[in-house]
Every structure is written in structure tokens, then in C-alpha cells.
Amino acid sequence: MKSTFKSEYPFEKRKAESERIADRFKNRIPVICEKAEKSDIPEIDKRKYLVPADLTVGQFVYVIRKRIMLPPEKAIFIFVNDTLPPTAALMSAIYQEHKDKDGFLYVTYSGENTFGR
């Protein structure tokens, strides 16, 4: 899944921004959250997040759900490097394992209707 954030900003600018964030916010993780291309789930209002290092993947999914005002009958899935991270994993662990060379963690979200409507 390709990132529109990456295509809009050159590597040097992204790298400089993530380094500035890391210097200012020691216990926060810079995350870029974008909707999967062919998903019918709503678009998110912002894609840059500074999440607490001790936030779980499940808690981050909850944040996304609220921001896109996803109805309860819809499911949401997040992917990091095309894999589904464990819900109980800490965002800091996911970041250490999957962060991009530019210093951001790229998360893609997608949804499907769990009740067949």
C-alpha cells in the first residue's frame, strides 16, 4: 500500500520533521495514518498523529474509529507494512519494528461490513 504522504513530501522534509518531533516529544511516536485505497470506509480528517509510546494498537484503533465516526456495525482493521499488528501490542514496539527510514510509522486502515450489509 503506497502512502500519499510519502508522495506529497520529499524524504528529507519527512526525515527532518520526524527528528524534530523525536527531540521535542520523547515519549511520543510519529504516526502517519491513511485509508487503504479501495476501502469503502470513511476518510480520516487528519493523518499525522503523535501517539503515546505506551498506547496499544487496540487503543489506537479506537482513536481512528472515533475520528472517522465509524458506525458500530462496521469493522476496522489496521495494517503496518501490509500485516495486521496484534491488538495488545504497544505502539512503541510496532514503531521499533516497522518504522520507516524517514522516522514515521505508516499505518493503513481498512474496513468491511461485519453484518453483510
UniProtKB/Swiss-Prot annotation:
Consequence the record notes for mutating residue 49 to A: Impairs ATG19-binding, PE-conjugation, and autophagic activity
GO CC term, one of those recorded: autophagosome membrane
Post-translational modification: The C-terminal Arg-117 residue of ATG8 is removed by ATG4 to expose Gly-116 at the C-terminus. This Gly-116 forms then a thioester bond with the 'Cys-507' of ATG7 (E1-like activating enzyme) before being transferred to the 'Cys-234' of ATG3 (the specific E2 conjugating enzyme), in order to be finally amidated with phosphatidylethanolamine. This lipid modification anchors ATG8 to membranes and can be reversed by ATG4, releasing soluble ATG8.
Compartment(s) where it occurs, according to its Swiss-Prot or TrEMBL record: Cytoplasmic vesicle, Cvt vesicle membrane; Cytoplasmic vesicle, Autophagosome membrane; Vacuole membrane; Mitochondrion membrane
InterPro entries named in the record: Atg8-like, Ubiquitin-like_domsf
Keyword check for Lipoprotein: yes
Single annotated GO MF: protein tag activity
Effect upon mutating residue 79 to A: Impairs interaction with ATG4, cleavage by ATG4, PAS localization, and autophagic activity
Resulting phenotype, residue 116 to A: No cleaving of the C-terminal R-117 by ATG4. Defect in Cvt pathway and autophagy
Pfam family membership, one: ATG8
Propeptide stretches in the record: 117
Membrane topology: Lipid-anchor; Peripheral membrane protein
The entry's keywords: Autophagy, Cytoplasmic vesicle, Lipoprotein, Membrane, Mitochondrion, Protein transport, Transport, Ubl conjugation pathway, Vacuole
Effect annotated for changing residue 28 to D: Impairs ATG19-binding and autophagic activity
Record lipid sites (Phosphatidylethanolamine amidated glycine): 116
Site feature Cleavage, where: 116-117
Regulation: induction: Up-regulated upon starvation conditions. Expression is under the control of UME6 which acts along with a histone deacetylase complex including SIN3 and RPD3 to negatively regulate ATG8 levels and subsequent autophagic activity.
Role noted for this protein: Ubiquitin-like modifier involved in cytoplasm to vacuole transport (Cvt) vesicles and autophagosome formation. With ATG4, mediates the delivery of the vesicles and autophagosomes to the vacuole via the microtubule cytoskeleton. Required for selective autophagic degradation of the nucleus (nucleophagy) as well as for mitophagy which contributes to regulate mitochondrial quantity and quality by eliminating the mitochondria to a basal level to fulfill cellular energy requirements and preventing excess ROS production. Has a lipidation-independent vacuolar function to facilitate the degradation of vacuolar integral membrane proteins during early-stationary vacuole turnover (EVT) when cells enter stationary phase.
Misc note: Present with 2010 molecules/cell in log phase SD medium.
Assembly: Conjugation to phosphatidylethanolamine (PE) leads to homodimerization. Interacts with ATG1. Interacts with ATG3. Interacts with ATG4. Interacts with ATG7. Interacts with ATG12. Interacts with ATG32. Interacts with ATG34. Interacts with ATG19 (via the C-terminal 10 residues). Interacts with the endoplasmic reticulum to Golgi v-SNARE protein BET1. Interacts with the vacuolar v-SNARE protein NYV1. Interacts with the UBX domain-containing protein SHP1. Interacts with the vacuolar membrane protein HFL1. Interacts with ATG45.
Protein name: Autophagy-related protein 8
Encoding gene, per UniProt annotation: ATG8
